[in-house]
Amino acid sequence: MTTSAQMKRIIMILGGKGGTGKTLHCRQLYFFLIQSGVNCLAFDADVENPEFQEYHTEASQSVTLIDFVQTEQAKAFFTQIEQQKPDVVLIDMPGASGRATRDQIKRFGMFKIAQQLGYRVTLDTVMNNAYNTINSLQMMQSFCGDRADYVVVKSDLWNQGALNFDRWERSETRKQFQALKGIEISMPVLELSTFDVIHEQGLSFFEQDQLPFGDRILLESFLDLSRPQLEAATDYLGLGFKTPKPSKKAEVSNAGK
C-alpha cells in the first residue's frame, strides 16, 4: 500500500497578500528539487507578478507561466501533469488568490484527480508576522482538511529584533495545523545586497556562478542554511524522489538494439 509519504506531490506555494518571501522560497525549493535529481515540473501562476518564471527565463530549468484560476489554462495544467507524470509539480500561486484557488480546486475536483494520478497535494504557506497569512491558511485548512498535507515556512526576515511569530504561535490556526500533522520550517535571510544583485541580473540559483564572488558565497551560505530546513519536510516537499538511473543490464541491453 502506498503511503502519503511515498506519493508524488503537487506543491502549491501560498503566501497571503504577498510580500512574505513566497517567490524566494519557490526558488530555493526548486533549486534543491532539481539538485536532488527529482523530476519536477514548475509553474508560476502569479501572472501579475511572475518573478518565479522571470528568474528562470535564461536557465535550462524553465518555469511555465500559467493562469491557474483561468479554466482553459487550468485544463492545460492538469493535462500536462497527466501526460508528463513528473514526480513533483511545483506551482507558485498568486497572493490573495485564496477564494479563486478554492473555487478552481472544487471545479476540477483536484484532490480526486491527484489521487487518481498517484499524487498527494501539499499546501506550502510562507509566513510573515501579519494576520493575513494566518487567516489565508486557516481558510485553506478548513476547506481542504486532511485531503492535503501542510508546510509552514517562517521567513526569518520577519523574525528579527521586535518582529516575531507570536501571532502565529498562539493562533487557533496553528493548533489546527498541528492536528493536521503540519510541518513548520524556517527560511534564512538572504543578504539584501545579494538579493538585489540577483534580482537586477535576473538570475536563477542555478546560475550562481555568474555572480560576483562575494555575492556567490552569500548565496551559497543561504542555500547551505536552507537545506536542513527543507529536508525536515522531505516527504511533504517531494525531496525524497530521485529520477531512477537505468541499470547497467538495461544499458547493455539498449546498446545492443
Predicted regions: what is each one?
Residues T3-M12, H25-C26, Q35-Q104, F108, ...:
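Nucleotide-state-sensitive switch-loop elements of NTP-binding domains
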Residues D156-P228:
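Beta-strand-loop-alpha "switch" segments that mediate conformational coupling across diverse proteins
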Residues N135, D209-K257:
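C-terminal accessory extensions appended to soluble enzyme cores
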Residues G18-G19:
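Walker A (P-loop) phosphate-binding loop of P-loop NTPases
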Residues K22:
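Conserved lysine of the Walker
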Residues Q104-A130:
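Inter-motif core of Ras-like GTPase G domains
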Residues F111, N132-R147:
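Conserved C-terminal guanine-recognition region of P-loop GTPase G domains, centered on the G4
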Residues F43, L123-N128, V151-D156:
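Conserved beta-strand segments of the P-loop GTPase G domain that flank and frequently precede/overlap
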